[in-house]
């Protein structure tokens, strides 16, 4: 049988999602916990690999097993062996044709950025940080150039293994919430797929525009160049959240977890 799990995690202490020799990745911790609960090795595939420091609100994985246990047992049993900053949120039996990555029709990410003259402390690692004010109108104008199908080579990491740089961004939304002498900015992205570091590189450009270093139309020049050298520096992974994949309704998989309501 094939089982899908929804996983949430804080990425601050880990070297990203994908398994490494060090064993200090989210995938390594999850597979170790699953193996202890199932008393046999378990290999997982994920909907989207995240970098070191990036958090996941609803990563989705799947694996095949001959064990027949109720779905609640997979949640409680696996969580019993996971560190406190990783948790299985739900488990569902899915058809053998389901693939957590291949069946996804879209992926969603969010950036939470603190605008403040003082760096974050309690929120360290959970928010990005800028100390110069951001111009929301300029950034909102800039994102209109990104929505749709484009060649995103200028936002692609050198080590990206994607076959094509052409992706379709369905939507980008920017909102803000005033704090005491500060602001929390919330950027949400949805696309059919993302290139390696694509969101972090886009964020670097949006921050540069928001701080007045470039005009919104500069993004058109960046995209036309199809060169990473044309774009702004990569933004910090702090404050970046993988909100999860989007699947067709007939799979019956949840699309939110409680952590969504926690985001600033």
Curated annotation (Swiss-Prot):
GO biological process terms, semicolon-separated: tRNA pseudouridine synthesis
CDD domains: PseudoU_synth_EcTruA (cd02570)
Pfam families on file: PseudoU_synth_1
Enzymatic reactions: uridine(38/39/40) in tRNA = pseudouridine(38/39/40) in tRNA
Residues reported in the UniProt entry to bind substrate: 109
GO molecular function: RNA binding; tRNA pseudouridine(38-40) synthase activity
InterPro entries listed in its UniProt record: PsdUridine_synth_cat_dom_sf, PsdUridine_synth_TruA, PsdUridine_synth_TruA_a/b_dom, PsdUridine_synth_TruA_C, TruA/RsuA/RluB/E/F_N
Annotated active site: 51
EC number, as in UniProt: 5.4.99.12
Quaternary data: Homodimer.
Family according to the record: Belongs to the tRNA pseudouridine synthase TruA family.
Alphabetized PANTHER family for the sequence: PSEUDOURIDYLATE SYNTHASE, TRNA PSEUDOURIDINE SYNTHASE-LIKE 1
Designated name of the protein: tRNA pseudouridine synthase A
Organism: Polaromonas sp. (strain JS666 / ATCC BAA-500)
């Amino acid at each position: 049988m094939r089982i899908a799990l929804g996983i949430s995690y804080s990425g601050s202490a880990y070297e990203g999602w994908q398994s490494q020799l060090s064993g200090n990745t989210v995938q390594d911790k999850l597979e170790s916990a699953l193996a202890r609960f199932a008393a046999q090795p378990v290999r997982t595939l994920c909907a989207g690999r995240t970098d070191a420091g990036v958090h996941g609100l609803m990563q989705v994985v799947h694996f095949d097993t001959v064990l027949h246990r109720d779905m609640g047992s997979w949640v409680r049993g696996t969580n019993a062996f996971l560190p406190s900053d990783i948790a299985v949120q739900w488990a569902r039996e899915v058809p053998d044709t389901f693939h957590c990555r291949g069946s996804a029709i879209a992926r969603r990410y969010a950036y939470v950025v603190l605008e403040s003259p003082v760096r974050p402390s309690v929120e360290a690692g959970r928010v990005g940080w800028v100390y110069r004010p951001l111009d929301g109108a300029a950034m909102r104008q800039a994102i209109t150039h990104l929505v749709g199908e484009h060649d995103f080579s200028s936002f692609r990491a050198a080590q990206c293994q994607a076959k094509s740089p052409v992706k379709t961004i369905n939507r980008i939304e920017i909102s803000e919430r005033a704090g005491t002498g500060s602001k929390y900015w919330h950027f949400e992205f949805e696309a059919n797929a993302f290139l390696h570091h694509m969101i972090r590189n886009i964020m670097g450009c949006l921050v540069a525009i928001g701080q007045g270093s470039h005009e919104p139309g500069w993004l058109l020049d960046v995209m036309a160049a199809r060169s990473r050298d044309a774009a702004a520096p990569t933004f910090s992974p702090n404050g970046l959240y993988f909100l999860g994949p989007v699947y067709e309704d007939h799979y019956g998989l949840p699309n939110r977890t409680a952590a969504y309501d926690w985001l600033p």
